[in-house]
């Protein structure tokens, strides 16, 4: 065999070995997984004991699922009667367990929110914030319902911290809360005549002492979350400030949470990346909607 033939054979063998190695041990870049947990509740009133009004949180989930799927996210959807406190906690715990280094994680909640009287005295204003699962009751009742199904911000923060640690510095966590921890009865002058008012949240705090909820007026719209060399970057987006109401908007005959709608619109043409650039686009769109002049999106982020 000529030296040229031997070289060709050797190159062919090397090529086969490289391909086999790539299949057995994929490069790290290809190991990144995009994961999304989407929770949305519309039909609260079908569980009459909870006393919550119907909204359109499940619409947000369906809207976003299609867009995130096009960006190759592995999607878990939990809506309406499925979205109990037990199920939401189970899915969050499962997400923590399944995450790997370098993953991109998106968590979305569309539903009601409520302020809850602070029990461990770690809140300056005396109130925690809670997302409201399908089976969380609106009113405190001693010995009957004392808030077990409210999912507090402290509990959510623990899940978020665990995810940030699992995905590490090369990963990313984005959290969207299209709810509200206040609520109102009217929106303003930019509504269409045939447009109903759907507000997410309530002004009634969940309190064993019937303590009235009086949120401080903080006009800061951007808060800094501490960064860590061993944890991923994080962005948390909220539909409005603590003293404002979050009103649904009507688009193409359907009602959506405004934050969800404009995130979806932005992600139609932008990738969900570890960056604030696409977040700023969402903010500009919300600021430009005349129906939303009385609410301001809030950004919490460890990114610079």
Regions found by a protein language model. Give the residues of each.
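Bacterial N-terminal signal peptides that target proteins for export
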Residues: 2-15
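Cysteine endopeptidase catalytic domains of the caspase/legumain-like
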Residues: 20-21, 25-304
């Amino acid at each position: 065999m000529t030296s040229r033939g031997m070289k060709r054979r050797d190159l062919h063998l090397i090529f086969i070995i490289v391909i086999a190695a790539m299949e057995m041990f994929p490069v790290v870049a290809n190991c990144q997984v995009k994961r999304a947990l989407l929770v949305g509740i519309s039909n609260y009133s079908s569980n009459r004991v909870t006393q919550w009004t119907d909204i359109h949180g499940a619409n947000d989930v369906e809207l976003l699922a299609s867009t995130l799927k096009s960006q190759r996210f592995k999607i878990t959807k939990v809506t309406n009667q499925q979205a109990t406190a037990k199920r939401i906690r189970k899915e969050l715990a499962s997400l923590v367990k399944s995450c790997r280094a370098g993953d991109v994680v998106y968590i979305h909640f569309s539903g009601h929110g409520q302020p809850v009287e602070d029990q461990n005295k770690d809140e300056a204003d005396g109130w925690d914030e809670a997302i409201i699962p399908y089976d969380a009751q609106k009113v405190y009742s001693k010995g009957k319902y004392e808030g077990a199904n409210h999912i507090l911000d402290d509990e959510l923060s623990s899940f978020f911290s665990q995810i940030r640690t699992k995905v590490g510095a090369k990963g990313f966590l984005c959290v969207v809360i299209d709810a509200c921890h206040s609520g109102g009865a009217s929106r303003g002058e930019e509504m269409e005549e045939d447009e109903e008012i759907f507000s997410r949240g309530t002004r009634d705090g969940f309190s064993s002492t019937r303590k009235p909820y009086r949120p401080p007026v903080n006009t800061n719209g951007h808060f800094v979350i501490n960064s860590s060399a061993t944890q991923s970057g994080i962005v948390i987006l909220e539909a409005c400030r603590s003293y404002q109401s979050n009103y649904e908007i009507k688009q193409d005959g359907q009602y959506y949470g405004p934050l969800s709608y404009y995130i979806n619109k932005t992600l139609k043409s932008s990738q969900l990346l570890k960056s604030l650039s696409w977040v700023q686009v969402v903010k500009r769109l919300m600021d430009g909607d005349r129906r939303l002049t009385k609410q301001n999106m809030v950004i919490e982020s460890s990114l610079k």
